[in-house]
Amino acid sequence: MLARAGEVGRAGPAIRWLGGIGAVIPLLALVLVLVVLVIEAMGAIRLNGLHFFTATEWNPGNTYGETVVTDGVAHPVGAYYGALPLIVGTLATSAIALIIAVPVSVGAALVIVERLPKRLAEAVGIVLELLAGIPSVVVGLWGAMTFGPFIAHHIAPVIAHNAPDVPVLNYLRGDPGNGEGMLVSGLVLAVMVVPIIATTTHDLFRQVPVLPREGAIALGMSNWECVRRVTLPWVSSGIVGAVVLGLGRALGETMAVAMVSGAVLGAMPANIYATMTTIAATIVSQLDSAMTDSTNFAVKTLAEVGLVLMVITLLTNVAARGMVRRVSRTALPVGRGI
């Protein structure tokens, strides 16, 4: 036993060294990706300027014609790019997905943990994990062939015809479309995000200690009061983390959105049913044509778009970590306030 303890003691520095390397590698990878994107996008950043974030036009110019040099950057004649519709489409579809997915996921996790028999709860939990692993292209195909047309023919017309004509809500009015657009994209993203949030939240609820819950019930609380006063405060910061995981999936999803969004560039969506596109879907759909640009300016612009998406994701995660800390400080410790 002493010999083994000595061996472990001698291996301690090596384990710490390997652990330090493992901790640094993700940070180095993130910095490397950022540096590569910035270097690749530098010409586009310099030429596109701030109007890149306010303009709506997406025009690669005459990629087979003459080229011009502006501010030291070569580009095709007529090339002009604006990313505002892409940013709006990305944020709007992610917001729609979370508005639907968060209550559904948390509610489903609560029902599984609180109401279902143990064996059935385990079976449903396994199904949720399997749903989280479905390839996005399969979900996108289902959305394009079945879900999108169903929404366009049966759900969207009801919403469009009954939505009040008042600011903000009038965005729900208009032509329901043919099964492609912002609403369908957001709903498809919600289908993909629900298993992620629900699985994580389900695991969190299962980790809540039994004694505080039993104490709350012994004091006369109903099951709902126990959930509200004990279970949710215990896992509140974890739920925020689960939502961030889902948001990251929604922001970066590519194939499913490309198949149901309509992939329309250069136009702001007029209503929630309008065809549009997102940053990730644009990078995929435009990469082939960008490679035909002999000046490489189109590729540089796509790199700038990718950099914008990465910055949005990083800012979202930083904000979420702040929310987790705030929720952790303000949430009642289990047992207080019961």
Swiss-Prot record:
Main location: membrane
Domain of life of the organism encoding this protein: Bacteria
CDD domains: TM_PBP2
Record localization: Cell membrane
Residue intervals passing through the bilayer: 19-39, 93-113, 123-143, 144-164, 181-201, 232-252, 254-274, 295-315
Record-linked Gene3D superfamilies: MetI-like (1.10.3720.10)
Induction of its expression: Transcription slightly induced by phosphate starvation, part of the pstB3-pstS2-pstC1-pstA2 operon.
Any single Gene Ontology cellular-component annotation: plasma membrane
Domain ABC transmembrane type-1: 87-320
Record InterPro entries: MetI-like, MetI-like_sf, Phosphate_PstC, Phosphate_Transport_Permease
GO molecular function, one term: phosphate transmembrane transporter activity
Topology class, membrane: Multi-pass membrane protein
Keywords linked to the UniProt accession: Cell membrane, Membrane, Phosphate transport, Transmembrane, Transmembrane helix, Transport
One of the GO BP terms on file: phosphate ion transmembrane transport
Pfam family, one: BPD_transp_1
NCBIfam families: phosphate_pstC (TIGR02138)
Subunit structure, as described in the record: The complex is composed of two ATP-binding proteins (PstB), two transmembrane proteins (PstC and PstA) and a solute-binding protein (PstS).
Task performed by this protein: Part of the ABC transporter complex PstSACB involved in phosphate import; probably responsible for the translocation of the substrate across the membrane.
Family classification: Belongs to the binding-protein-dependent transport system permease family. CysTW subfamily.
Descriptive protein name: Phosphate transport system permease protein PstC 1
Species assigned in the record: Mycobacterium tuberculosis (strain ATCC 25618 / H37Rv)
